[in-house]
């Protein structure tokens, strides 16, 4: 049987990077002692008040169709929070609910881009951005971000990548996988380029609430940007609700209308009981997020302190989020070999970061998704594996 060219455009190295994670999940299901640090699904349970509201709504019969773009009370709550953090007034008409941020990015790409367009994206970039852009028929143009700069954007390189075919700039701040938070000066420069070249900006801000040392700034807060920015966010990371699939897109009301028509054909609305639970998540947001941020900060510090002592590894201290980039190029293996050999030898799954772009070659991504004791054990296993490589290397060289 024949399939459309779309399925080919969705294939690629970036989406195949999950193979080691799937192998780790299968090993864990068989009862093997594995530590899975290869994906951003934390070990926290969703806060009880949120769960109880979902159960209450289910028992109350909230199991019918809902408004395609989302119920007004939840959209209004999201709009109020966005207004508070950006200083730019938006309302429920500027918000559409999505089945997680991933769904929002995909929908935005389809509504903004078409064949012949180019989308400029700093690299390393999140794994699925390329497939989302290619699904629209557009071409993703990566802008390499040098590890020597701590993976901070070179705005001159971004400007050089813009052509008459450029339609949009996509980026994440804080960034997955690097944990970099874009400073205001870089965002001001991107905003200036977007206004100058009449470009859309899609800003993935899923980790905005989980910043450590550097304050998060939304590009939608800058002058002249609200009307050309699509802000994507979710409750997945900030509230330990990855499996609930609650995300949203914020943008001009006209765009929300287009997204709604796409959602009519694609999603047909989030379940009502989930939306009711999400409202409770917003009511308790301040405390939940503060607690979550502190846990991730402690976990980050545990991993950084332990792995920074391991000869052959170089850790980059993340400014936000739940991941750390670790340079393993000093170990004598490429990242595919390193991750798979580590997994088979020590039962720890990390993600080969080269899947996020060539600029991440030599790095692996480690997630702070288990408790501190388990993270410490994972670090010990990684250290033992690296030490074993260094013991074997002289023997191999002598042979």
What are the roles of these predicted feature ranges?
Residues 2-6, 10, 20, 26-34, ...:
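PLP-dependent class I/II
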Residues 13-15:
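Extracytoplasmic catalytic/substrate-binding loops of multi-pass membrane glycan-assembly enzymes
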Residues 36, 55-68:
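Phosphate/diphosphate ligand-binding glycine-rich loop within oxidoreductases
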Residues 65-98:
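Conserved N-terminal alpha-helix of the aminotransferase class I/II PLP-enzyme fold
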């Amino acid at each position: 049987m024949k399939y459309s060219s779309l399925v080919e455009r969705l294939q690629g190295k970036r989406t195949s990077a999950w193979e080691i994670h799937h192998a780790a999940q299968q090993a864990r299901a068989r009862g093997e002692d594995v530590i899975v640090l290869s994906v951003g699904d934390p070990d926290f349970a969703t806060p009880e008040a949120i769960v109880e509201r979902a159960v209450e709504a289910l028992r109350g019969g909230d199991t019918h169709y809902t408004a395609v773009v989302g119920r007004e009370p939840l959209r209004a709550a999201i709009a109020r929070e966005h207004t508070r953090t950006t200083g730019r007034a938006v309302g429920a008409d500027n918000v559409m609910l999505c089945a997680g941020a991933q769904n929002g990015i995909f929908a935005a790409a389809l509504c903004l881009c078409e064949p012949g367009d180019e989308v400029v994206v700093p690299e390393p970039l999140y794994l699925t951005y390329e497939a989302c852009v290619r699904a629209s028929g557009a071409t993703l143009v990566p802008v390499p971000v040098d590890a020597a700069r701590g993976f901070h954007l070179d705005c001159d390189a971004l400007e050089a990548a813009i052509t008459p075919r450029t339609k949009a700039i996509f980026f994440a701040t804080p960034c997955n996988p690097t944990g970099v938070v874009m400073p205001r000066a870089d965002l001001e420069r991107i905003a200036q380029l977007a206004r100058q070249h009449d470009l859309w900006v899609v800003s993935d801000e899923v980790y905005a609430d989980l910043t450590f040392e550097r304050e998060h700034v939304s590009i939608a807060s800058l002058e002249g940007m609200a009307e050309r920015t699509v802000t994507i966010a979710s409750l997945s990371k900030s509230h330990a609700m990855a499996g609930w699939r609650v995300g949203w897109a914020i943008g001009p009301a006209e765009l929300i209308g287009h997204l709604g028509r796409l959602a009519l054909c694609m999603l047909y609305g989030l379940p009502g009981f989930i939306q009711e639970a999400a409202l409770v998540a917003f009511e308790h947001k301040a405390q939940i997020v503060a607690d979550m941020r502190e846990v991730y900060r402690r976990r980050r510090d545990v991993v950084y302190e332990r792995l920074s002592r391991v000869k052959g590894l170089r850790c980059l201290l993340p400014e936000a989020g739940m991941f750390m980039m670790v340079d393993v190029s000093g170990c004598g293996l490429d990242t595919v070999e390193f991750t798979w050999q580590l997994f088979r030898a020590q039962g720890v799954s990390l993600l080969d970061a080269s899947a996020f772009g060539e600029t991440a070659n030599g790095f692996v991504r480690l997630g702070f998704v288990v408790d501190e004791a388990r993270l410490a054990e994972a670090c010990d296993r990684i250290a033992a594996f690296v030490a074993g490589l260094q013991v074997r290397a002289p023997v191999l060289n002598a042979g």
